[in-house]
Every structure is written in structure tokens, then in C-alpha cells.
């Protein structure tokens, strides 16, 4: 460990990578034993027959498990929030069969690119059931999304300007949401969106209202990847409520129609 006393800069400790073959039942480098249990069938179909037909390696997805997990989550939220709407993130896995399964269960399509948007449309997802997120939306993609009444969450001032241009061309006002980033504990995910703590998000709200071409109808936030810490989502929800009251008290936006969207 090398330290500069003047600037208090510490050199990061180097840990040599560990590459070993893990075996079911034995501890890994973190002291945890993998809990994978071999089983011969998936949804009643013998795995050996699938391997004979498609070869190996082979990724197999259980439709029954997907549907059961979705219904469990929907039930858990619906008990407390009857108007909850679950959306499936296409970037997680955009295989058409998987996306179609969640669509059949009632999930909206959450997409982050024109490519994923096209997948949703190929599955006959209605525009109003598509949530269009992502930091790089082209004017062509936004124009299509507006025409098909998709739910659009703005990531930057550039998108505000693009959508205002589209609104002028179509002689209409466009409902939008904005993406917030915020301090949510140990996790830092502030690459995209408008910052809550610095008041950048509120400045974006004022800019949207001043333009007169867009209507704020939603708040969106993404907590990061591989994150199952419930406390982080609690923090996000609390800050969403704080921001809602800030908008209600300090701007002329109609807050009664605002929706919250977590990712």
C-alpha cells in the first residue's frame, strides 16, 4: 500500500484474479457453495432429447417458471398498489419467445433502442404499451414513438429539443417523462438523466414547462444492474415523493397525472 501524505491519495490494492473450476457442493472464493441441482427435465421435456436435437452448449428457458415468477411479482405489488403496471426490459433478453411470454402475461415492453422498439412492434405490442427509455434516441425513432403514442422518458436536454421540434412539426403537445439520477447509498448510477440532489432535475421540469410543447407525465429512475437491495428502491421511492412535492409546490405543472417508473 503506497500513500502520498500530502494529497492523501491511496493506491488501490491489487488482487490477483482467481480462475478455478467450481464444482457443485464445494465452496467458491466467496465462501459460498453453488446451489445448482442437476435435474433431467425442464417443463416436462427431457433435457437429453433437447441436447440430441440442438446440440451443446444449449440455453434452456422454462416458460412455466417465467410465468410463475411474473405472476408472483404482480400479485405482491397489486396487493398494495392496485394500479401497478409491470414492464419487461427487452435488453435483459430480447429473444422473441421470451418477450412474447411476458407480453401475454400483461407486461408492457420497456425498450432502450430503435432495434428493441422494432422487436416490440414485430410482436404486435401497441405503441401505448411501449416505454421508450435510453440515452440515445434519434429524431426518427422519437417521431415514430410519438406517432404511435409510446411512453417516452427523456434522458437529456438534447431530447427535449428534439421532441419540441417534433411537436412543432405535428402541431401538438407531447406527454413525456424525465429520467432522474440520485444518490441511493453505496450504488452510484448517475451517468444518465437529470440529477435530483443538484436541482438539475427541477431545472429540466421548468424548461419543459417553459417550452409549452411538452407535458410532464412521468418520473423514471434506474437503480443500476444486478441490484436486488430493497433498501435502494425504498430510497428511490422516497426521493420520488420528495420531487413530486417540489414540482407541486414550485412549478405550474399538473402533478395529478404524474406516474412513477422504476427500473
Predicted regions, residues:
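A charged N-terminal "starter" segment
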Residues: 1-168, 172-174, 215, 249
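Short, well-ordered amphipathic alpha-helical segments that serve as non-catalytic structural scaffolds
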Residues: 201-206, 237-247
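Alpha-helix N-cap and loop-to-helix initiation/capping positions
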Residues: 137, 155, 192-200, 228-239
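Short connector loops/turns at beta-strand edges and beta->alpha or beta->beta junctions
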Residues: 47, 137, 181-185, 213, ...
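Single conserved hydrophobic/aromatic residue that forms the stacking wall/gate
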Residues: 253-263
Amino acid at each position: 500500500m503506497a500513500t502520498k501524505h500530502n494529497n492523501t491519495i491511496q493506491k488501490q490494492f491489487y488482487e490477483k484474479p482467481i480462475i478455478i473450476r467450481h464444482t457443485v457442493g464445494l465452496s467458491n472464493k466467496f465462501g459460498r457453495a453453488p446451489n445448482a441441482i442437476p435435474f433431467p427435465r425442464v417443463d416436462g421435456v427431457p433435457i437429453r432429447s433437447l441436447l440430441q436435437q440442438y446440440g451443446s452448449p444449449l440455453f434452456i428457458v422454462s416458460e412455466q417458471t417465467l410465468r410463475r415468477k411474473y405472476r408472483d411479482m404482480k400479485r405482491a405489488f397489486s396487493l398494495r398498489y392496485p394500479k401497478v403496471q409491470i414492464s419487461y426490459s427487452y435488453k435483459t433478453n430480447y429473444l422473441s419467445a421470451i418477450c412474447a411470454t411476458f407480453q401475454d402475461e400483461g407486461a408492457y415492453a420497456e425498450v432502450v433502442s430503435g432495434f428493441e422498439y422494432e422487436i416490440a412492434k414485430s410482436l404486435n405490442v401497441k405503441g401505448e404499451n411501449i416505454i421508450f427509455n435510453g440515452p440515445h434516441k434519434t429524431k426518427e425513432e422519437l417521431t415514430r414513438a410519438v406517432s404511435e403514442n409510446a411512453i417516452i422518458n427523456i434522458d437529456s436536454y438534447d431530447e427535449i429539443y428534439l421532441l419540441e421540434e417534433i411537436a412543432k412539426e405535428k402541431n401538438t403537445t407531447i406527454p413525456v417523462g424525465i429520467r432522474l439520477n440520485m444518490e441511493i447509498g453505496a450504488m452510484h448510477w448517475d451517468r444518465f438523466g437529470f440529477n435530483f440532489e443538484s436541482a438539475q432535475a427541477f431545472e429540466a421540469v421548468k424548461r419543459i414547462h417553459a417550452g409549452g410543447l411538452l407535458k410532464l407525465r412521468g418520473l423514471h429512475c434506474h437503480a443500476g444492474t444486478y441490484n436486488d437491495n430493497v433498501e435502494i428502491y425504498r430510497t428511490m421511492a422516497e426521493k420520488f415523493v420528495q420531487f413530486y412535492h417540489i414540482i407541486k409546490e414550485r412549478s405550474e405543472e399538473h402533478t395529478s397525472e404524474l406516474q412513477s417508473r422504476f427500473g
